[in-house]
Amino acid sequence: MKQKQYKLTSEGIAELKTELDMLISSRSELAERIKSAREFGDLSENAEYSSARQDQERAEIRIAEIENILNNSEVIKQPKKNDTVSLGNTVVLKDGKTEKTFTIVGSVEADPMEGKISNESPIGQALLGKKLGEKVEIKTPSATNTYTIKEIN
């Protein structure tokens, strides 16, 4: 089965590498917590031990996940300034008097609260390939809105 290719900005790769380094460096602390918790006796009723093991398991799962993403990622090249929306662009949309700004990134980096939307999201899909000044209809689960593309950076 073919591995999924993840699309990441260079900033996204740097953030993942920082998180990976932090998780790897926490391994010894987690091992020490498990060792200390074992000293409390019966492991079947030892909440500290169970908690430490769960934290260790979550960290190892996240380490494997990040390593997989980094090993199967493609860097989004900084798009040239042009009049067509592509992956990596920041787009300013206008709906009457309301303006919204989105940066189109790969799904791993998506963070709607920070204005980073996935190229796989309804908004991302609606914007990709559209041109400056073009009207775009964006369908989301809650509504359908029409925006004009005011800026592409």
Task: Set out the residue ranges of the language-model regions.
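Non-DNA-binding regulatory cores of transcription-related proteins
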Residues: 76-153
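A generic alpha-helix structural signal
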Residues: 17-20, 67, 127
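N-terminal cationic and glycine-rich segments that engage phosphates or anionic surfaces
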Residues: 2-54, 58-61
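Conserved NTP-handling cores and scaffolds of large molecular machines
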Residues: 24-27, 70-74, 131
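Internal alpha/beta loop-helix hairpins
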Residues: 56-79, 83
